[in-house]
Amino acid sequence: QFVRGFWPFCASVFVLMLLSDGFRPALFVAIRGYSKPENRTRAVTLLRLAINLGFSLGPAIGGLIITHVSYEGLFWVDGISCFAAAGLMLVALVPKRSTAEEKAQAALAKGSPYRDRPYLFLLFSSILITIPFLQYFSTVPVFYSEVHRLSEFSIGLLLGANGLLIFLLEMPLIKYCEIKGFSRFSVLRFSVLLFALSFVVLNLFPVHAFLWAGIVLMTMGEMLNFPFMNRLALDRSDRGQPGAYMALFTISWSVAHIFGHTLGLNLIAHFGFTITWWCFTCMLAIGAGMLYLVERNMAREHAGTQKA
């Protein structure tokens, strides 16, 4: 609100993003501390629902405030809402006292995420999977507009279906997977297959109806992938400092954001949409291969621990 000039504005955005990105690992660590181990996946899913709800309501509320008040009013409401959230956390989240067993486990868990090879492979696979996923919010809308000549309203309906499906189906879907006892890596591999199929549909079926099939496949993959990927990272953080582990996991998302949008737009500019979608399908296949390596490494570790 009070910043004037390009570079001061850049500095203020940097500070804002630094604080917000520092908040995300703390959220994951809080889930680890306040939820039971068997409920971690659903706890992450509930957190994702809250974030998606904020993303859905935020632009609409912000637009109303800008229209009827001003940008300054938006900044004041935004700041006050952050203070309100902090106050709610202070009141509602009672500091949890560690038990003697938890303190003993924390004393033994001195692992570093930078020396945890399976975890680093997991992060790399996460980047390879997230980059294609992000295309649905950057380059795929361009594809809708330029190739299929969809209006902004139609594009908004397609993207809005993503949020609606997540709101209605994600929690029941995760609960179903847990009841059936599907392994996490099986669910992750299936989710990557759904991501890949969403791009294959865009290439092989250039019909408007199949754009809906693509967004449904992508959304189903998203609902299955990210809760279980977060759960794997949370469980792995038991080996060391949870904050360091989850901060590195958050960084992997930031890396995907940094390179994903630019990579997609440049591929389209040089090779067109069809080759770009095949490239991202291949990237997803590599990501699935990395997940297989992670699963093998973790299984080998588990077998070695049992022998010891």
Label for each model-derived stretch:
Residues 75-90, 277-292:
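Symmetry-related core transmembrane helices of the 12-TM Major Facilitator Superfamily/SLC fold
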Residues 94-123:
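Juxtamembrane intracellular "pre-TM" segments in multi-pass secondary transporters
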Residues 138-154:
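Short amphipathic helix-loop junctions that connect adjacent transmembrane helices
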Residues 179-192:
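Cytoplasmic membrane-interface "Motif A"-like loop-to-helix N-cap segments
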Residues 14-51:
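Cytoplasmic helix-loop-helix junction between adjacent transmembrane helices
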Residues 8-22, 210-224:
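Hydrophobic core of transmembrane alpha-helices in multi-pass small-molecule transporters
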Residues 1-4, 193-206:
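C-terminal ends and interior cores of transmembrane alpha-helices
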Residues 170-182:
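Helix-to-loop junctions at the C-terminal end of transmembrane segments
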